[in-house]
Amino acid sequence: MIKTLVVDDSALMRRAIRDMLESADDIEVIGTAKNGKEAVENTNKLKPEVIVMDVNMPIMDGLAAVKAIMKTTPIPIIMFSSLTKKGSIEALEALRLGAIDFITKPSGLQEISKIENELVTKVRNLYNSNVNIIRLLNLKKFKGEVINGNWNCPDQNLGILIGSSTGGPSSLEQIIPRLPGDLPASVFIVQHMPEGNFCSQLAARLDAISELEVKEAENNEKVKIGVAYIAPGGYHMEIRKALDVTRIKIIKGKPMHAVMPSVDVTVESFVKVYGNNSVAIILTGMGVDGASGFKKINESNGATIACSEDTCVVFGMPKAAIEAGAIDVVKPIFEIPEQIVRMIEVKCNGN
């Protein structure tokens, strides 16, 4: 049984969440808490294996509770987030503090049943995926310098693709800020996120701490060199080239591998545009998204990198790509920025 702690200031919401979780035969709610202070106390006392927690609570809010729990008893935490801009900022802050995932919380109790399947699946996946919280916390401690490159390829069409899921926002903060502002490539980031303001806030955060411009991708916008584009949550991102102009297409299609955006969906078009002038990186995450796509990049003589198991929060996606024979180089996340720059140098300078 997966021992779970439920934290919410509403007694009705706690009961509803408890009922949803315990509808699964492999999940047991071993306790509840009505604020962050009780959550910290019950975590130390009851030793849950997964925590489901709201952000906005009295006495101690969810963000403060995440921070406190990570200091004493780091375990997987799923946060509830609203669809508002404020909610998306809070969700990303929770991820930076050590929470592993979040779920958008319905506005009313009558809507709560709509997230039952997602909630049960996420609790189950976190428990079964060997999530390494210590690695996530260690990511936050490392502060690397910008890696500069030596290149001269003003007319070359170079593309970088990065795929990530669980633990991805913290991993991206170890990569994007260390890429130089004169990088002669366009960067495309596919981070599994739900629809809402989450990816725009992630882009704003990365843009504020990076030399590169980082933005949420918009439909039909022209792709520029030296810009990193993040796929909007809940939509697929494709890259199309016509009459020597490369543009982004944002599509509300069907999920692939149960996710949208999907790395594999983006790769299908990315590899047609960039081919052997591409560098692709698969970071932390559950599942197999990216494995088949990276194989196509590899077969097109593009360069592929996977994050090493010892620096992954969840090794699912990199492991799947490695086992598919789709990866050229496996590197610790702290070495990936330099590896990207060196690979771009080779493709740019023709060495």
UniProtKB/Swiss-Prot annotation:
Q: Which PANTHER family match?
A: PROTEIN-GLUTAMATE METHYLESTERASE/PROTEIN-GLUTAMINE GLUTAMINASE (PTHR42872), PROTEIN-GLUTAMATE METHYLESTERASE_PROTEIN-GLUTAMINE GLUTAMINASE (PTHR42872:SF6)
Question: Which parts pass through the membrane?
Answer: none
Q: What is this protein called?
A: Protein-glutamate methylesterase/protein-glutamine glutaminase
Where is the major localization of this protein? cytoplasm
Q: Where in the cell is it found?
A: Cytoplasm
List residues of the Response regulatory domain: 3-120
Q: Give the superkingdom in one word.
A: Archaea
User: Any idea where the CheB-type methylesterase domain is?
Assistant: 160-347
Protein's job: Involved in chemotaxis. Part of a chemotaxis signal transduction system that modulates chemotaxis in response to various stimuli. Catalyzes the demethylation of specific methylglutamate residues introduced into the chemoreceptors (methyl-accepting chemotaxis proteins or MCP) by CheR. Also mediates the irreversible deamidation of specific glutamine residues to glutamic acid.
- The gene that this protein is the product of is cheB
An example GO BP is: chemotaxis
Q: Does this UniProt record's set of keywords contain Acetylation?
A: no
> What SMART domains does the record point to?
REC
GO MF terms here are: phosphorelay response regulator activity; protein-glutamate methylesterase activity; protein-glutamine glutaminase activity
Protein keywords: Chemotaxis, Cytoplasm, Hydrolase, Phosphoprotein
Provide the top EC class.
Answer: hydrolase
Q: What's the record's remark on domains?
A: Contains a C-terminal catalytic domain, and an N-terminal region which modulates catalytic activity.
- Reactions that this protein is recorded to catalyse: [protein]-L-glutamate 5-O-methyl ester + H2O = L-glutamyl-[protein] + methanol + H(+); L-glutaminyl-[protein] + H2O = L-glutamyl-[protein] + NH4(+)
